[in-house]
């Protein structure tokens, strides 16, 4: 999409575009919305990737919500509250990703058909409280790795998507830490590597 070559000075820093050129570029292809001539990514590929991120966040909302409703056992009320809080935060991620897809000219895919195959993480209910915590920790670890890869992928080609994912990653890392701490509290020791 980027048809505007970046000129560089002797030190390698890009020249700043003059205001008149910026104004002229902004008037071209206004139907493209936020996607301007300086957008460095592949819009269709970005939307495709973000559809997978959206599916992942939807699955996380569903899993955390299910666990918030069904968790039982000693100290389950505090864990249920943690699950409910995470579901709320995952829903905020879901909305941010859906809005970004829309900004790029796509239609967010909320269709439940095929949701599990589009998602990086799996939907697992867990048989008991510890299983639920483990499933959420696994899902968060998948999300952390996936989002780190995507942040590197988008790099400077799509800084807005990258920054959005960096914000989501920060929360996903907090969720993973929360689930790890809950697992240690309920198993009485740090989990061993498999």
Model regions: which residues?
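Iron-associated oxidoreductase/ferritin-like identity signal
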Residues: 1-194
